[in-house]
Each structure stands twice: as C-alpha cells, then as structure tokens.
C-alpha cells in the first residue's frame, strides 16, 4: 500500500475540516434565515388579510372598489372575496403573474395553508368576515416565488463561498504544510546522509517550531549516545580480542615447546603445562566476567533480593582474607548499629571482593586496608581505602571502563584484566547505588559506595 505524504495528508485534513465547517455553518444559517423570511412572508400576508377584514367591516360591499382592495394588499398578493356559500364575489391583484385562484369550502376552511400551482408555491390566508354590512370570506393569495428565489440565492451564495473558502484553505494549508514538513524532510535527508557517512554528521537546523526543534535536539542526543555506544562496543571488541590473544599466544607457544622438546624433557613439560593451565584459568575468568557484564548490561537482577546486614558480611570477608593473606592488615570501622540493604547476597559479596582485591593489588608495600561503614541521612555508605600507588586524577573518570588499567604492565603482572571495577559499578547501579573515588598518587585511594 502506497503511503501518502504528510504534507498531502495535512492539506486534505485541513481542507476537509474547513469545508465541513463552512457547509454546516451555512446550512444552519440558511435554515434559521429561511425560517425568519418565511415568518415575514406569513406576517405580511396576515396584515393584508386583517386590513381587508377591517375594510369590509367599515364599508358596505357595494362601496368597496378594487382600488380599495389593492391599497390593503402587499407585494405579490391577490385577494378574493367569497360569500358564505363559497361563491366568489370579486378578486383583484397587484401582481398579474398570480393566476392561481383557489376555491373554498365553507364547511372546511383552513386559515393558513400553502398550495402549489404549476410548480409555484402560494401562501393562502383565509379569514371569516362577520359584520352587519357583510358576511363571507376573504382569501389572500401570497406568492412565495420571491421568497424561494431569495432562499435559492442564499444556497448559491453559500456554495460559491464554500468553494472559494475551500480553495483558499487548500492553498494556505499547502503553504503551511510545506513549512511544517520542510524541517522533517531536511531531517530525513540528513539522516540518510548520516546513514551513508557515519555518526560524525549532525542535524543542524533551526525551524522556529518548538516541537521540531526539540525533535532535532533529541535526535542529535540519540546520535551522540549511539556513537558513544558504537565506539565503546568497538573498543570493547578490540580490548577483548587483545586480552584473549595474549594468553592464547602463550598457550600456543608452550604447546609448540612441548611438541618440540617437552616430550622427552619432564621439566619443560611440567613448566609449560603449568603456564598453559594458568593462562587457561585467566581466559576462563575473562570469559565469565564478560558474560557477567553482558548480563548486567541488560539490567538483569536474576538473583534473590534479600535484606543483607552489611557489617556481618564485611566482617566475614575480612576474616577469610586475613587468614588467606596474613601479611595484610585489615582495619574495619563498623557503624555501631546493624545496617541492612536489599540486595542479592552473592552480588554484594562479589562487589566487596572486587574492591578489596583491587585495594590489595595496588598496595603491595604498606599492605594496610581500611574499611568503614556509615549511616547518614538514611544513606548507607561503605568506604574502602588502600595506601598504595594511587590513581592520577586524569585517569579517575576512566577506571570503570572495561579493560581500562592505569598501569597496564603492573595490572597484568598482578593478574588483572580491567573488568573488575566495571562489574562492581554495574552491580552498584543495578541496586540504585552510587560510587565515588578519591585518590592521591603514591598516598591512598578511597572507593565510597553509597546505597
């Protein structure tokens, strides 16, 4: 089905609405106007009939002349005089075109009636005359042809006016619809250009229409988000490929080493297998974290949400880590009252381990980790501080990006792949939390998580 242009549709709608409005308005006006004119015709005929009755009440019939009767008649009228038996006594008219002469039946007289003769309409007013001087009937024949011609002229004028108004409306609608759709057409052309040339093109238009200007702003913002998302996705693929390439090359190198000398040399075989298994573990962890990030990007909260008392969870994690890393000092300053948040317990533990593990990696000299919980303004905060190498201020805004590492060589030696903080931030955001970083190079780094 062929789609119509918005400009054509707008013009058709406005023209149709205008035509229907004028049509209905004209019908209503003509209806009331024709009724008013008809009442005027009836009033005029009744006045003439009343004058005729008064004339015969004041004069003997023998003294009434046609001139007297004509003086009582209005325009386009004829009068006929009947006795009580229905016999016509006289008639006169001021309009020779009125040839219609109705008869009356004394036993069945309608005072006001409309009759037709040769496709002409007449208003008939019949009055009974009772006076000492004459008894009978006066009949006024009032032509309605002038009234009909006037009403027909009104219909014709309304039709001409409607056609002219509709035509003018169509022209105006075409002009305005062209003005309204012009920015949309320009936007469409610009979008096609963007599709051909890429995200670097932006729609730069000012239409003086709030709606279309807002649409352009929204479109440009959407394009910026798409460009950013596309660049992040491309960078993500490049970084993931790089991270996977290194351990795979190491594994391939050691497999070649085993194939060449390891079959006969047990030491080379064992060393190569250990290194290959270590790299396989790194790959497995990397893939698991990538899958977790992908799931989190879909705003997934598949875990069981429960009330978690964070002081107990942190104390439990610190106890386990202290036994595993006895050379580290963990200082926990817990809020004196229980602090409960609604979160998936596994996600909370994972987030906590990521931050503590990150603090331990970058504090290899002092090996002193501080953890503090607070409650302020109904907000629960967790602060994790290490006293290691710190983060340069220019790098702080990027540390939550995937695969981003402040010191790539150091991070790889420590077993990092740049995904941990991204995962932790996703967990925090999924649970309506925020994260703030404060750091000074070679002094400290503090991660503050707020729920």
Swiss-Prot record:
It is found in: Cell membrane. GO terms for cellular component: plasma membrane. It catalyses: ATP + protein L-histidine = ADP + protein N-phospho-L-histidine. This is Signal transduction histidine-protein kinase ArlS. The gene is arlS. SMART domains: HATPase_c, HisKA. Autophosphorylated. The lineage of its organism: Bacteria, Bacillati, Bacillota, Bacilli, Bacillales. It is a multi-pass membrane protein. It comes from Staphylococcus saprophyticus subsp. saprophyticus (strain ATCC 15305 / DSM 20229 / NCIMB 8711 / NCTC 7292 / S-41).
């Amino acid at each position: 089905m062929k789609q119509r242009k918005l400009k054509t549709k707008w013009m058709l709608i406005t023209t149709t609405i205008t035509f229907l409005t004028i049509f209905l308005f004209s019908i209503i006006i003509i209806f009331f106007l024709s009724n008013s004119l008809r009442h005027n015709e009836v009033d005029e005929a009744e006045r003439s009939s009343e004058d005729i009755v008064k004339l015969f009440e004041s004069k003997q019939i023998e003294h009434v002349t046609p001139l007297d009767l004509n003086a009582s008649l209005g325009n386009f009228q004829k009068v006929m005089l009947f006795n009580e038996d229905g016999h016509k006594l006289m008639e006169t008219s001021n309009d020779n075109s009125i040839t219609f002469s109705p008869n009356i039946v004394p036993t069945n007289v309608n005072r006001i009636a409309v009759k037709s003769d040769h496709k002409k309409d007449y208003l008939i007013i019949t009055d009974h005359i009772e006076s000492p001087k004459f008894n009978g009937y006066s009949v006024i024949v009032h032509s309605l042809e002038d009234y009909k011609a006037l009403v027909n002229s009104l219909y014709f004028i309304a039709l001409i006016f409607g056609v002219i108004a509709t035509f003018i409306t169509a022209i105006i609608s075409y002009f305005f619809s062209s003005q309204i759709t012009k920015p949309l057409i320009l936007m469409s052309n610009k979008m096609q250009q963007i599709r051909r040339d890429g995200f670097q093109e932006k729609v730069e238009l000012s239409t003086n229409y709030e709606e279309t200007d807002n649409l352009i702003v929204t479109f440009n913002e959407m394009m910026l988000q798409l460009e950013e998302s596309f660049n992040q996705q491309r960078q993500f693929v490049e970084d993931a490929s790089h991270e996977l390439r290194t351990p795979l090359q190491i594994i391939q190198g050691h497999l070649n080493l085993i194939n060449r000398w390891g079959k006969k040399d047990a030491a080379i075989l064992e060393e190569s297998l250990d290194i290959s298994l270590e790299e396989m573990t790194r790959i497995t962890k990397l893939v698991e974290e990538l899958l977790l990030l992908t799931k989190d990007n879909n705003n997934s909260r598949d875990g069981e949400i429960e009330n978690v008392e964070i002081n107990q969870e942190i104390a439990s994690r610190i106890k386990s880590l202290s036994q595993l890393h006895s050379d580290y000092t963990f200082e926990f300053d817990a809020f004196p009252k229980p602090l409960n948040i609604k979160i998936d317990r596994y996600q909370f533990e994972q987030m906590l381990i990521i931050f503590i593990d990150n603090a331990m990696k970058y504090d290899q000299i002092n090996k002193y980790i501080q953890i503090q919980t607070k409650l302020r303004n109904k907000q629960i905060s967790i602060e994790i501080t290490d006293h290691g190498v710190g983060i340069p201020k220019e790098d702080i805004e990027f540390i939550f990006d995937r695969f981003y590492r402040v010191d790539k060589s150091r991070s790889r030696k420590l077993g990092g792949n740049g995904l941990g903080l991204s995962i932790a931030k996703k967990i925090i955001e999924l649970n309506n939390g925020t994260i703030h970083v404060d750091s000074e190079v070679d002094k400290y780094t503090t991660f503050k998580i707020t729920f």
